[in-house]
Amino acid sequence: MTSAAPAKKPYRKAPPEHRELRLEIPGSRLEQEEPLTDAERMKLLQEENEELRRRLASATRRTEALERELEIGQDCLELELGQSREELDKFKDKFRRLQNSYTASQRTNQELEDKLHTLASLSHSWIFAIKKAEMDRKTLDWEIVELTNKLLDAKNTINKLEELNERYRLDCNLAVQLLKCNKSHFRNHKFADLPCELQDMVRKHLHSGQEAASPGPAPSLAPGAVVPTSVIARVLEKPESLLLNSAQSGSAGRPLAEDVFVHVDMSEGVPGDPASPPAPGSPTPQPNGECHSLGTARGSPEEELPLPAFEKLNPYPTPSPPHPLYPGRRVIEFSEDKVRIPRNSPLPNCTYATRQAISLSLVEEGSERARPSPVPSTPASAQASPHHQPSPAPLTLSAPASSASSEEDLLVSWQRAFVDRTPPPAAVAQRTAFGRDALPELQRHFAHSPADRDEVVQAPSARPEESELLLPTEPDSGFPREEEELNLPISPEEERQSLLPINRGTEEGPGTSHTEGRAWPLPSSSRPQRSPKRMGVHHLHRKDSLTQAQEQGNLLN
């Protein structure tokens, strides 16, 4: 057994001390004590057991120490594991929060990106709107420039039109002055044919002029006395009541206008029409031809019927019904404040006198129709209007002969007056009624016959335009047809020559009545035969009025 034991290799390699012990001791002992007895063998085995026990105890202690170390390490590792787990949880929370914030920031970024896209689209639309506004501004600038140019052109046009209006105003003033200078355009009116108010105004005017000239008693006016148109113009220029269609002065406490609007109603019926009876307040014609109201005829002014107040008219009034004062006649209406013209201008009074002289011929149309004249050259028909022609035969004979020359003269005179703007010739400028030099001679001749002062009344005044005379006229006058139509001479010398023989007739027969006929020897041979068309060119534009006037027996300018 011993020889075979060392020869065997152990199963595993033992530690060095064990190998040394096992190899050295038993081998040496076996080699040295091979012949040992059993007792020695037992002793050696016991020692080996004790040594093994000692080694086992040390190994156990080491194992326990290692176990304790392992437990301590395990506790430390568990602590570290818990800490690492806590840290992991913290990290997980942080990661979760970071992830949430990231998603939130991502959503915010998406929203911001959408807003940026919308802002970009809005900016594009804004840019387009800005470009459009700039284009509109440029267009408006161009329009402003064009409108400014148009305004400048309009201003220049307005200035030119104002200059033309000024020229036309001056031309109208010149035309009115020419019409006023040419006294043969208007006929004289009988004192009895004038309206009552106009008779009172003429009587006051003549009485005031006579009192200023001589303090003696003023002569009375005869019904057949002839009132020149210039006297009517002078009377109507005075600031008195100009309401010929009202018995009361509706403008007594108000300032009067310089010019009034004359409306001639040409749409009424025949004066003798039974459909238009006299109104209660109409005046009754007196035997001497003068007009008196009903209150004055009865002798009680308190019993006068109230008349309607004066109604102001627009510049183009509608025709009114027949007035109670003048039933069946042409109503002349006035407006005091529609036409305002400066006080210095000669246009208002002249225009008013011209229209009044024309319209007065329409007022007495009723009396002309009431007495038809068998003789074609009666004064009523001869004095109906400046263009009255008693029979159509002289018109057909004289008008074609002088129509060409009169039209040419008209064109030449109007071109010279209004186009070339040349002053009127001396012969036309001197066509006034009576000058200052003619008044003393007429006073001297008419002062010899005191019996005729009821018929012949002079109108003295400080101005030459007011120094005209009221002359009588009778039916059987020896006028030529042209003089009978126009009834006024051209120059003051011819007027004086036509008026002076009347004084001689009154001196020869002072006791004769004013109803006797007197011949007025006018120098008709020295005057050229003129055509009635020299009145003006208005007949070319008022054909309806001309036709109606020809049918009624009156020619209206």
UniProtKB/Swiss-Prot annotation:
It comes from the Eukaryota. Residues 274-286, 316-325 have a biased composition (Pro residues). Residues 530-542 have a biased composition (Basic residues). The modification N-acetylthreonine is found at residue 2. It is a peripheral membrane protein. Residues 378-388, 546-557 have a biased composition (Polar residues). It is found in: Golgi apparatus, trans-Golgi network; Cell junction, Tight junction; Cell membrane. Keywords: Acetylation, Cell junction, Cell membrane, Coiled coil, Golgi apparatus, Membrane, Phosphoprotein, Tight junction. One of its GO terms (cellular component) is plasma membrane. Residues 394-405 have a biased composition (Low complexity). The keyword Membrane applies. Residues 14-23, 439-456 have a biased composition (Basic and acidic residues). Residues 42-171 form a coiled coil. Residues 1-37, 266-303, 309-328, 364-409, 439-557 are annotated as: Disordered. The modification Phosphoserine is found at residues 300, 320, 345, 491, 545. Ubiquitously expressed. GO terms for biological process: Golgi organization. InterPro entries: Tjap1/BEGAIN, Tjap1_dom. The modification Phosphothreonine is found at residues 318, 422. Interacts with DLG1. Interacts with ARF6 (GTP-bound form). Plays a role in regulating the structure of the Golgi apparatus. This is Tight junction-associated protein 1. It comes from Homo sapiens (Human). The gene is TJAP1.
